[in-house]
Amino acid sequence: MAHNVFCARYKQEMEGLDEPPFDSDFGHKIYNNVSKRAWGEWIEHQKMLLNEYRLQPWTPQAQEFLVEQMNQYFFGEGAQLPKEYVPPSPR
């Protein structure tokens, strides 16, 4: 059965994730408040952050940074783009 949520990013009822993305209070907050669509968009944004900041995701510092950015992306005013980020040109 589909899990629906009122998506924090889109401010509307949407299909939710199949399971919490990680086992923590924050993971359950995402599960209960973030849609599949918004989560997929976060994954793409996270890839950009990893590449632009050359983060090593296994380090505690990178993990803290990504959780902070994720919190801003979904529940704050939106995650900031790196100052020198240039979006890829359309093909």
Swiss-Prot record:
<dbReference type="InterPro" id="IPR007457">
    <property type="entry name" value="Fe_traffick_prot_YggX"/>
</dbReference>
<dbReference type="GO" id="GO:0005829">
    <property type="term" value="C:cytosol"/>
</dbReference>
<comment type="similarity">
    <text>Belongs to the Fe(2+)-trafficking protein family.</text>
</comment>
<protein>
    <recommendedName>
        <fullName>Probable Fe(2+)-trafficking protein</fullName>
    </recommendedName>
</protein>
<dbReference type="GO" id="GO:0005506">
    <property type="term" value="F:iron ion binding"/>
</dbReference>
<dbReference type="Pfam" id="PF04362">
    <property type="entry name" value="Iron_traffic"/>
</dbReference>
<keyword id="KW-0408">Iron</keyword>
<dbReference type="InterPro" id="IPR036766">
    <property type="entry name" value="Fe_traffick_prot_YggX_sf"/>
</dbReference>
<dbReference type="GO" id="GO:0034599">
    <property type="term" value="P:cellular response to oxidative stress"/>
</dbReference>
<comment type="function">
    <text>Could be a mediator in iron transactions between iron acquisition and iron-requiring processes, such as synthesis and/or repair of Fe-S clusters in biosynthetic enzymes.</text>
</comment>
